[in-house]
Amino acid sequence: MTLNFSKPIFALAPLAGFTDLPFRSVVKKFGADLTVSEMISSNALAFQNRRTIKMLEKSPLETPYSVQIAGSDQDVIKKAVEFINSKDGIDIIDLNCGCPAPKVVNNLQGSSLLTDLPTMAKTIKSIKKYSNKEFTSVKMRLGFNSKNHIEIAKICEDSGADFIAVHGRTKAGKYKAEVDYEAIGEIKRAISIPVIANGDITTPQKAKWVLEYTKADGIMVGRGAIGKPWIFQLMTNYINGNRETEPTKELIAKVVLEHFDQMIAHFGDYGAIIFRKHLHTYSKGYSGSSKFRDLVNRIDNVKEMRDITKEFFLI
């Protein structure tokens, strides 16, 4: 299945440490149209770091599938893209122009590319030139310290991006400033390629409002999907006028355990430790959740953690 913008797209945003293969495979079962890898260093790809190569893997459900890379060194970008070209099942290469983390920004990657638009343009063009994948995309913010979102979006379009995802804050706004949906709408009106809206879209009602207000071609959900991977199904049902039905306790338990099992299959026993943060979010709102979180923080045995998790969610 290719990417079809004839109706709104519902995409999972890349989130470091969360949107790995097991989690992406769970959200696909709830109707996410597009999944994106965690942000991957182009340098690590160029030098074929073993751990990084594993981050490229996808589940059979992930079609279309996007790999997001970070970088600005043109030789390194070329090598990274050529390595991605050798992997089947990847439909999109996405350039990260939004990450505000200091370790990324300090190396002219992520949102710092918004301070050097000629280099950003050159990097998009390099990806487009060397990629054998169907799409090239960009995930951007509204600017670095101040907003110059239309200029950035037009450069993305002119440099060959097939679509963009826009986080409605500047880099300075990080994840706390109010999201400027008006600016996303301005971008949509200013360019001809599809625009996906991103930022604080955590409910079906908010998703519908953002689509109507911005006229965007899709919604990208990040933190709103953590602990609630079924949010994509709720959103599509609500927007299509179908009855919005929250998942049953039994379904949630099934999802949590399936996610846990996939973590172990993908990461080995260490997957149980990684899964603790997911259990923290899955258990929010449950009676006894504080005690449960404290307990799982002290468990690293796979069987013991699974048994305790099953017991907690099926009470």
Q: Language-model segments: which ranges?
A:
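Short, charged, surface-exposed secondary-structure boundary motifs
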Residues: 45-48, 174, 228-234
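N-terminal small/glycine-rich loop or linker at the start of catalytic domains
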Residues: 1-10, 43-64, 99, 104-109, ...
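Conserved, mostly hydrophobic/aromatic
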Residues: 12, 27, 38, 67, ...
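Active-site beta-loop-alpha junctions enriched in small/polar residues
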Residues: 15-17, 40-42, 70-72, 98-100, ...
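Structural preference for beta-strand elements that scaffold enzyme active sites
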Residues: 9-11, 34-36, 64-68, 91-94, ...
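Alpha/beta catalytic cores of nucleotide-metabolism and tRNA/nucleoside-modifying enzymes
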Residues: 1-6, 21-22, 130, 145-163, ...
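Glycine-rich, positively charged N-terminal anion/phosphate-binding segment
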Residues: 2, 15-91
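Alpha/beta enzyme core
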Residues: 78-109, 118-193, 209, 213
